[in-house]
């Protein structure tokens, strides 16, 4: 599973130069989560999970507060969660998750991004079966054995726990997100380097230098779209 963690590191490495885009995406997601129930993370589990993820990207409080206030007040925008699946060069696969208030616009934009950058959209289910929906955590200061012991004491059976250059990575079922995070907090973990939901590939592929350049342009084009929240793929980027 080491390569899967590299996928997350790639996202983190891009964080500094894409902060405004990341903040905008979280602002939208926080608004939708707050609008779906009580605008209080204590009583709204969906909102709580979004806020926990936002912390790992250092989303400022004013962005969070503004989104929640909008949900409390006159905000009447309705958003749909959409998923697109497609293919890039030489067997590469992508999953594109979007949050949009205009389905036709988003579908057109995603299709154009694929078509202009060496890819093509697939039908629903053509790619997703090759990925696993996963809750992923990254913590420092706790060894693999310590984390495993903590989880065993709480009777939490996760998919895997690995070490990656001193960072302990936990892969769990999506519905274990809050349970795993609470257990690690009780064991003294104060900061999560990663707390994220991922679609992780069951197998990875490598591309030639030429194909990888095309693939990276495709990812950039998709991630630059206003409505796109996440892009997951099966390529081991070198």
Swiss-Prot record:
Show the GO cellular component annotation of the record. cytosol
Cite the GO molecular-function annotations of the record.
DNA binding
Keyword Amino-acid biosynthesis in annotation: no
Keyword field contains Flavoprotein:
no
- Keywords associated with the record: Cytoplasm, DNA-binding, Transcription, Transcription regulation
Q: Which SUPFAM superfamilies match?
A: YebC-like
One BP term from GO: regulation of DNA-templated transcription
Subcellular location(s): the record lists: Cytoplasm
**Which InterPro entries does the UniProt entry name for this protein?**
Integrase-like_N, TACO1_YebC-like_2nd/3rd_dom, TACO1_YebC_N, Transcrip_reg_TACO1-like, Transcrip_reg_TACO1-like_dom3, Transcrip_reg_TACO1_YeeN, YebC-like
List the NCBIfam families hit by this protein, alphabetically: PRK00110.1, PRK12378.1, YebC/PmpR family DNA-binding transcriptional regulator
What does the similarity note say? Belongs to the TACO1 family. YeeN subfamily.
Q: What is this protein called?
A: Probable transcriptional regulatory protein SERP0322
Organism whose genome encodes this protein: Staphylococcus epidermidis (strain ATCC 35984 / DSM 28319 / BCRC 17069 / CCUG 31568 / BM 3577 / RP62A)
Give the organism's phylogenetic lineage.
Bacteria, Bacillati, Bacillota, Bacilli, Bacillales
């Amino acid at each position: 599973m080491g390569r899967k963690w590299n996928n997350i590191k790639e996202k983190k490495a891009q964080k500094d130069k894409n902060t405004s885009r990341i903040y905008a995406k979280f602002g939208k997601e926080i608004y939708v989560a707050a609008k779906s129930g009580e605008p209080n993370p204590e009583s709204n589990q969906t909102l709580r999970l979004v806020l926990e993820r936002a912390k790992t990207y250092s989303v400022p409080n004013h962005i969070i507060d503004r989104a929640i206030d909008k949900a409390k007040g006159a905000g009447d925008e309705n958003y749909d969660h959409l998923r697109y699946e497609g293919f890039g060069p030489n067997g590469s696969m992508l999953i594109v998750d979007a949050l949009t208030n205009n389905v036709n616009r988003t579908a057109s934009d995603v299709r154009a991004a694929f078509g202009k950058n060496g890819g093509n959209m697939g039908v629903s289910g053509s790619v997703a079966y090759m990925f696993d929906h996963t809750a992923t955590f990254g913590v420092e200061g706790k060894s693999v054995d310590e984390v495993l012991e903590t989880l065993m004491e709480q009777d939490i059976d996760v998919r895997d726990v690995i070490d990656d250059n001193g960072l302990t990575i936990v892969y769990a079922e999506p519905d274990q997100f809050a349970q795993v995070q609470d257990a690690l907090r009780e064991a003294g973990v104060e900061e999560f380097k990663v707390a994220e939901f991922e679609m992780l590939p069951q197998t990875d592929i490598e591309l030639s230098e030429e194909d990888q350049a095309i693939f990276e342009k495709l990812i950039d084009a998709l991630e630059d779209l206003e409505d796109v929240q996440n892009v997951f793929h099966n390529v081991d980027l070198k």
